[in-house]
């Protein structure tokens, strides 16, 4: 069977170490050659590519990327595809198409679905379905505790970092410090990243009615507000809340 060759030329190639004009040769869906330097037309592109890669024969497809930047695909470490159980919001197909359209080749999906992704079995099923769509690679996180209940970390004890590089309780915190420590130890022994939502849920709940009251006042009376600085002793940072509902924040 003939190989499918794509030659992308006249692009600006950008990664962590370069920002130069050049061309890229793709064979059967995989990059097999990168050449730096200005290449103005398809004839020049073919001469350069075939002189170094003699396997380039036949009629390759040429793409003139003039005015475009060519970069490696991006990685999004926190996405919500809402699958399974919340597909009225998003699903694998729409999420993966959006990722591919935005240049994201790898995404890490959160476990707050219905049911919660608390087992390797369910996570593998989701990743298998995603891979069949051939749009972007999905790493499905497993919840730190079973069903977000904050008690049982048995499901993460034997995960492999190759399959599950990240675990997360997503938009909540494991309140019990002993349970969180056990979960971190389980992840640490396998070099798995623990993505934490560092927020005391009791303090967050207490603040909610006051936040809602302020937003309602701003919305009803068209009152603008500036930045709200949230400062702790060790994290002198600010959070910029922008356009919550119809309030101008």
Predicted regions and their residues:
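N-terminal metal-binding scaffold of metallo-dependent hydrolase/deaminase domains
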Residues: 1-55
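Divalent metal-coordination and catalytic microenvironments
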Residues: 11, 24, 29, 67, ...
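Divalent metal-dependent hydrolysis catalytic cores, especially in the metallo-beta-lactamase
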Residues: 93-117, 134-146, 160-175, 191-199, ...
């Amino acid at each position: 069977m003939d190989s499918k060759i794509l030659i992308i030329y006249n692009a600006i190639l950008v990664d962590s170490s370069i920002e130069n004009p050049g061309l890229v040769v793709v064979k059967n869906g995989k990059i097999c050659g990168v050449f730096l330097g200005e290449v103005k037309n398809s004839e020049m592109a073919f001469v350069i590519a075939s002189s170094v890669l003699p396997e380039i024969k036949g009629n390759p497809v040429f793409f003139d990327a003039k005015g475009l930047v060519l970069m490696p695909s991006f990685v999004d470490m926190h996405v919500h595809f809402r699958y399974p159980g919340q597909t009225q919001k998003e699903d694998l197909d729409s999420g993966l198409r959006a990722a591919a359209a935005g240049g994201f080749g790898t995404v890490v999906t959160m476990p707050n679905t219905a049911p919660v992704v608390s087992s390797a079995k369910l996570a593998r099923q989701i990743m298998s379905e995603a891979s069949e769509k051939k749009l972007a690679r999905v790493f499905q996180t497993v919840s730190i505790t079973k069903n977000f209940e904050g008690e049982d970390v048995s499901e993460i004890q034997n995960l492999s970092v190759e399959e599950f590089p990240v675990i997360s309780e997503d938009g909540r915190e494991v309140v019990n410090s002993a349970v969180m420590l056990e979960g971190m130890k389980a992840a640490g022994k396998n070099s798995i990243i623990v993505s934490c939502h560092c927020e005391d849920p009791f303090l967050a709940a207490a603040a909610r009615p006051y936040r809602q009251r302020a937003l309602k006042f701003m919305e009803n009376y068209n009152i603008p507000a500036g930045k709200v600085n949230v400062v702790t002793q060790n994290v002198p940072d600010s959070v910029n809340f922008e356009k919550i509902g119809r309030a101008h924040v």
